[in-house]
Amino acid sequence: MAKEAMIERQKKRERLVAKYADKRAALKEIARDEDLPMEDRFKARLKLAKLPRNSSATRLNNRCQLTGRPRAYYRKLKMSRIKLRDLASNGQIPGMVKSSW
């Protein structure tokens, strides 16, 4: 299981991304708009750079909801391969059965 601090850090990043998403999108739109003067676009870039680093969505990791494990993550189920195997073998995931042929 991942350390509690890592899981909490991830949750903090998720909150920051949600908080600054609209502001970040607006500044990016201004910075990309070629109809605006170069000075305004540059100011938008500077404001974007002053936002917190962790407010960028690229800083987020996918983590298992049950264990916090960042690797071997299944997006559809939001869990790692290890917990997926445990729950599936115990019959706790509806519709998932062990394959045999």
From Swiss-Prot:
InterPro entries: Ribosomal_uS14, Ribosomal_uS14_bac/plastid, Ribosomal_uS14_CS. The keyword Transcription regulation does not apply. GO terms for biological process: translation. PROSITE patterns: RIBOSOMAL_S14. This is Small ribosomal subunit protein uS14. GO terms for cellular component: cytoplasm; small ribosomal subunit. It comes from Jannaschia sp. (strain CCS1). Keywords: Ribonucleoprotein, Ribosomal protein, RNA-binding, rRNA-binding. Part of the 30S ribosomal subunit. Contacts proteins S3 and S10. GO terms for molecular function: rRNA binding; structural constituent of ribosome. Binds 16S rRNA, required for the assembly of 30S particles and may also be responsible for determining the conformation of the 16S rRNA at the A site. Disulfide bonds: none annotated.
